[in-house]
UniProtKB/Swiss-Prot annotation:
Membrane disposition: Single-pass membrane protein
UniProt keyword Methyltransferase present: no
Annotated transmembrane regions: 9-29
One GO CC annotation: plasma membrane
Subunit organization: Part of the SecDF-YidC-YajC translocase complex. The SecDF-YidC-YajC translocase forms a supercomplex with SecYEG, called the holo-translocon (HTL).
Keywords linked to the UniProt accession: Cell inner membrane, Cell membrane, Membrane, Protein transport, Translocation, Transmembrane, Transmembrane helix, Transport
GO process annotations (BP): protein transport
Function of the molecule: The SecYEG-SecDF-YajC-YidC holo-translocon (HTL) protein secretase/insertase is a supercomplex required for protein secretion, insertion of proteins into membranes, and assembly of membrane protein complexes. While the SecYEG complex is essential for assembly of a number of proteins and complexes, the SecDF-YajC-YidC subcomplex facilitates these functions.
Domain of life of the native organism: Bacteria
Name by which UniProt lists this protein: Sec translocon accessory complex subunit YajC
Main location, first listed in the record: membrane
Length: 102
């Protein structure tokens, strides 16, 4: 029986660890990074009048946008202020109107 050289075993372990790191990167880190970027662009595109949903499931219409907060009108006389990060999506069926560029 031949014994594997210590250098070969070490090289195999290094290659194995690099492969695990690459799998971790492409399956976890990269998709999260893309999702964060998509959410950032979504938040930047919000305008007054947009119909949105918060992470807690509250549906409302944007009435005010601050640097770090967004105020939603959720009922006739009810407005609630949220952190921008709490806004996760447009309401189903809501079509955002594009501004015409002349």
């Amino acid at each position: 029986m031949e014994q594997q050289s210590p250098v070969g075993a070490l090289l195999f372990q290094i290659i194995f660890l690099v492969a695990i790191f690459l799998m971790f990167y492409f399956l976890i880190i990269r998709p999260q990074k893309k999702e964060r970027e998509r959410h950032r662009k979504f938040l930047e595109s919000l305008k007054k009048g947009d119909k949105v949903i918060t992470s807690s499931g509250i549906w409302g219409t944007v009435v005010e946008i601050g640097d770090r907060t967004i105020t939603l009108k959720v009922d006739a006389n009810t407005k609630i202020t949220f952190s921008k990060e709490a806004i996760v999506a447009y309401q189903p069926g809501y079509e955002k109107k594009e501004e015409k560029k002349d």
